[in-house]
Amino acid sequence: DDVRNVHWLSSAKTGSLMIRQYEATRRTDTALTISVNPDDYIDSQEFELAVSVHASIGVQCLQQNRPVTAHAGSTHAIPRNATEFLDGCSGIDPDIDDNPNLAQTTLEHAPDASFYFFTVGRLKTIDDIKHMVLALPRSATCVVLQAATGQPRAIKRYSDFTLATVGDLNDLPMIMGVLA
């Protein structure tokens, strides 16, 4: 044991060497961002799938007591519980004026998150996604969930992010299990 971990006062009182014990903890602040630009989606059904994916991820994080910062277009929130988060998700509507660089607006509100989830549609190109994640801190983990109604689930790892294709909401538990 390192001498810096010796609790000298307790050691002097007890007459034997007392070592500090630390509990391993890791705070995981999570930023959840969904693209609300309808140009990123094939149709309204795909947009609704994206909203459902976004909502499911947020609820899971909140149930695990992980702090969440949620972003949808110009709306930014720090929900305290799953009900509050789902209420916010019920108001997510398409917005053609949404900033295509989701990371830029996310970083304005959650610059120190350790985990970034971006939910986009299948029309968001891989080049756009790669450009988007460049701004994120290297120490953070980034997962891009691409809603693509009817497509087979898939996971592809890149150097700075992981891309998961979600063709059906029922695919999400398996995808998240692989990513865990």
Predicted regions located by residue number:
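Exposed, interaction-prone extracellular/peripheral surfaces
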Residues: D1-A180
